């Protein structure tokens, strides 16, 4: 809930700046058309099913709010630094994720800090139950937690790979320590971070994979990552609660004991793959996204939640907006490296919705 209020506050700041100074390029507004199909499908599903659950209408407004909030932040940072470019903004994002990761570690080490930080934000019933049930079993983020934290930490790893390939790294040692820190803490918060790590690794290896210069440069960085990662993993095995370590690396521990590359989470995910039994659900959905204290149909799989809510139309239209953002961005930036980044991020989003 606190994220929503902060987003609204930043959005109001962005709207105010736009009205006063009109610093937003009006051509960017065209991406909002990508929100219209999913909003219309949401209205149709809510009315036809008589549930009046217009989740994706509110989603559309939240994306517009994020749009203005993002421009407000870009404007503020741009005023403080001359020649502020995309790489600078991506660095700011990475630093914020690093600070969030540090805060998650400190909240685990100091329970009083955890209690204080969570006392100043409001959670819904489902989030509150998840925080209570997992306390002491895994690290908990603040503002960004669980699956959401895994997504953000994974995205930070992908963006850091872009910065490395774009030669925007000054102190490689410090940069690598931050990369490993975000990776390890991200895994301790949500194992979904591993997906982002795999995408960042794929991005790194696929870029100019035949170029001798880049092969040497990438191998040196990967070696450095491995050395620091070994130190980081050794630290958490020595100094963190065994329950947290067992949870974070459960999949690898099971694999080592011939139980397969699985965990309680992946086993539960398999159980969540339930499919609609009626044609009506495939066409217009059931018009429900969340219930009071659990997910509709007890599934947290992204594609299935979209399918049960608004049928195939919502499941397809949901991805029109990110596609239009990427299309508009590609028209602005011609860098092959950046184009590859957008492709990786879009593929990352598609894969995450299987979870």
What does each model-found stretch correspond to?
Residues 1-5:
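Short, small-residue-biased leader/transition segments that mark boundaries at the very start
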Residues 10-23, 155-167, 312-332:
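Hydrophobic, aromatic-rich transmembrane alpha-helices
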Residues 19-33, 163-176, 212-219, 326-344:
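Membrane-interface helix-loop-helix junctions at transmembrane boundaries of multi-pass membrane enzymes
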Residues 34-40, 52-76, 88, 92-97:
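Aromatic-anchored transmembrane helix interface
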Residues 91-118, 141-189, 194-207:
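Alpha-helical transmembrane segments of multi-pass inner-membrane proteins
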Residues 102, 108-111, 205-257, 277-280:
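A membrane-periplasm/extracellular boundary helix in multi-pass inner-membrane enzymes
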Residues 244-313, 330:
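Long extracytoplasmic/lumenal interhelical loops at the membrane interface
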């Amino acid at each position: 809930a606190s994220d929503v209020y902060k987003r609204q506050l930043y959005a109001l700041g962005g709207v105010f700046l736009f009205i006063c100074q009109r610093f937003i390029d009006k051509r960017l507004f065209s991406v909002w058309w990508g929100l219209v199909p999913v909003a219309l499908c949401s209205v149709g599903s809510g009315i036809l099913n008589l549930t009046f659950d217009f989740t994706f209408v509110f989603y559309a407004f939240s994306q517009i709010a994020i749009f203005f909030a993002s421009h407000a932040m870009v404007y503020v940072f741009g005023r403080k630094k001359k020649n502020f470019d995309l790489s600078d903004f991506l660095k700011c994002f990475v630093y914020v994720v690093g600070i969030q990761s540090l805060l998650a570690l400190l909240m685990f080490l100091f329970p009083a800090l955890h209690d204080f930080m969570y006392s100043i934000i409001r959670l819904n019933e489902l989030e509150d139950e998840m925080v209570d049930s997992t306390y002491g079993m895994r690290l908990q983020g603040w503002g960004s937690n669980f699956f959401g934290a895994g997504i953000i930490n994974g995205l930070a790893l992908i963006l850091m790979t872009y910065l490395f390939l774009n030669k925007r790294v000054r102190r490689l040692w410090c940069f690598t320590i931050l990369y490993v820190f975000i990776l390890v803490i991200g895994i301790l918060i949500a194992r979904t971070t591993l997906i982002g790590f795999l995408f960042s690794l794929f991005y790194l290896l696929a870029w100019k994979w035949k170029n001798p210069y880049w092969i040497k440069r990438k191998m040196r960085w990967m070696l450095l990552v491995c050395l620091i990662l070994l130190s980081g993993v050794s630290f958490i095995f020595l100094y963190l609660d065994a329950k947290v370590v067992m949870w974070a690396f459960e999949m690898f521990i099971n694999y080592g004991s011939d139980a397969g590359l699985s965990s309680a989470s992946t086993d539960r995910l398999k159980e969540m793959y339930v499919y609609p039994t009626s044609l009506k659900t495939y066409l217009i959905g059931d018009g429900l996204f969340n219930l009071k204290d659990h997910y509709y149909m007890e599934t947290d799989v992204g594609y299935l939640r979209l399918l049960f809510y608004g049928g195939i139309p919502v499941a397809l239209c949901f991805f029109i907006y990110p596609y239009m953002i990427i299309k508009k961005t590609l028209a602005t930036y011609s860098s092959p490296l950046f184009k590859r980044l957008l492709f990786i991020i879009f593929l990352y989003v598609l894969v995450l919705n299987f979870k």
